[in-house]
Structures are given as C-alpha cells and as structure tokens.
From Swiss-Prot:
Functional summary from the UniProt entry: Probably participates in efficiency of electron transfer from plastocyanin to P700 (or cytochrome c553 in algae and cyanobacteria). This plastocyanin-docking protein contributes to the specific association of plastocyanin to PSI.
Transit peptide, from-to: 1-78
UniProt entry tagged with the keyword Cell division: no
Name the UniProt record assigns to this protein: Photosystem I reaction center subunit III, chloroplastic
Protein family per UniProt: Belongs to the PsaF family.
Keywords, ordered alphabetically: Chloroplast, Photosynthesis, Photosystem I, Plastid, Thylakoid, Transit peptide
Keyword rRNA processing among record annotations: no
Species of provenance: Flaveria trinervia (Clustered yellowtops)
Length: 232
C-alpha cells in the first residue's frame, strides 16, 4: 500500500551585490513527492518484534544459567528438609541400642528357659527386625531418631501413608457395606431386632464374601438411585 503527498517549498531569497544593486528576490517553487509505503513499515515492525523476542529469550536463558549456577544442588538422600535416612541416622541407631539394652536388663531377671525369658527374647528379635526394616525401606528420621511419615503425595513415599490409607479406607468400607447389606436383608423379617442382637451367621458369612466388591456394588447402586433411601 502506498500513497503520494505533494508539497511545495518556497526557496530563500537570492541576495547579490547588496551595495550596488537593489535586492532582487526570486521565488522558485519546486514540487517534492514523499512516498510512504505500508509494506515497508510492516517489515520494520516485524524486524523490531523479532529482535525484541530474541533479546527476551537471551535474557531468560542468561538468568536461568545464573540461577542454576548460584543455587546448590541438594543431595539425593535429603529430599525432605530436616530429615535423613534412618539407616544413616545416629539417633536412630542410638534408639535401637537403648531398646535392646532395656530388654537385655529385663532378661537377666528370669531363668534362661523360663516363659518370660523366651517372651523377652522373641521381643528382642522383633525389635531388631523392626529397626532393620525401617532402614531397608528407606524411611526418613528426624533429629529425634524417630521415623517420620511423608504425606505430601511423593511417589517415593507412597508406601508410608498413601497405600496404607487406601487399604484402611477399603477395609472400613467393606465392613460398613457388609453391615448395611445385613440390615437390609433382615428388615423384612418378623423380628428384625432379634437378628440384630443374635447374628444370623450363615447370612452374615454370605454377605461377608460379597462385600469384597463393595466399591463396584456401591457405584452400581448410586447409578440406579438405590444407594440413598429417599424416604430418610
């Protein structure tokens, strides 16, 4: 896109031989054309935009390099602030020694082959096994030497809280679903209260095994509108 603007300029006066001749002026009118091209402006704007974008990307790259060079890399084991792996914790090892020492002092009070002595020995073996498992499973201990459960959702620590939590919810839902099914099954009996006091074992056993699939059954009843009693 282009357009032309015509303008005229008045030339300055020509003064020659001021002393001997009068001032003569000549005005020369000249025509000048100014051509403005829209495509040229667009090219200039695009070039300016590209150059500014390059400058911005270069600044971001430089800032990321500076930040990465100034922030120290954290050790792989110290993934949670203030916690260390239990197998490397001195306080954790100290607690294990103290627990075993107390059991050994109690063991001296009984005869070697007596029942209390055998029970204490079994407890000592369980204590050793428990501390070994804490170290092998990668649990993290604090400054007190006690294992800390990580509940932030980190996949590396799912076995500490997420998995047991889901298992707990499943078992609790299973028990509740079986109890609900039992109450629904006996509500049409002549004496339903009597069967609540004295459990019908064959019926309860049958419902107990059906309850393993309670999430699917609950979802099916929810879709059918049978999960919630509308009269309540």
């Amino acid at each position: 896109m282009s357009f032309t603007i015509s303008t005229s300029f008045l030339q300055p006066l020509e003064i020659s031989n001021l002393k001997s001749s009068p001032i003569t002026s000549k005005s020369k009118v000249t025509s000048t054309s100014i051509v403005c091209s829209g495509s040229t402006d667009e090219k200039i704007n695009n070039a300016d935009g590209k150059s500014s974008l390059k400058a911005l990307s270069a600044a971001l790259a430089l800032s990321s390099i500076l930040v990465s060079s100034t922030v120290p890399a954290l050790p792989a084991s110290a993934d949670i602030s203030g916690l260390t792996p239990c197998k490397e914790s001195k306080q954790f090892a100290k607690r294990e020694k103290q627990s075993l020492k107390k059991l050994e002092s109690s063991l001296k009070l009984y005869a070697p082959d007596s029942a209390p002595a055998l029970a204490i020995k079994a407890t000592m073996e369980k204590t050793k096994r428990r501390f070994d498992n804490y170290g092998k499973q990668g649990l993290l201990c604090g400054s007190d030497g006690l294992p800390h459960l990580i509940v932030s959702g980190d996949q590396r620590h799912w076995g500490e809280f997420i998995t047991p939590g889901i298992l707990f919810l499943y078992i609790a839902g299973w028990i509740g679903w079986v109890g609900r099914s039992y109450l629904i099954a006996i509500r049409d009996e002549k004496k339903p209260t009597q069967k609540e006091i004295i459990i019908d074992v064959p019926l309860a056993t049958k419902l107990l095994f059906r309850g393993f699939s309670w999430p699917v059954a609950a979802y099916r009843e929810y879709l059918n509108g049978e999960l919630i009693d509308p009269t309540v």
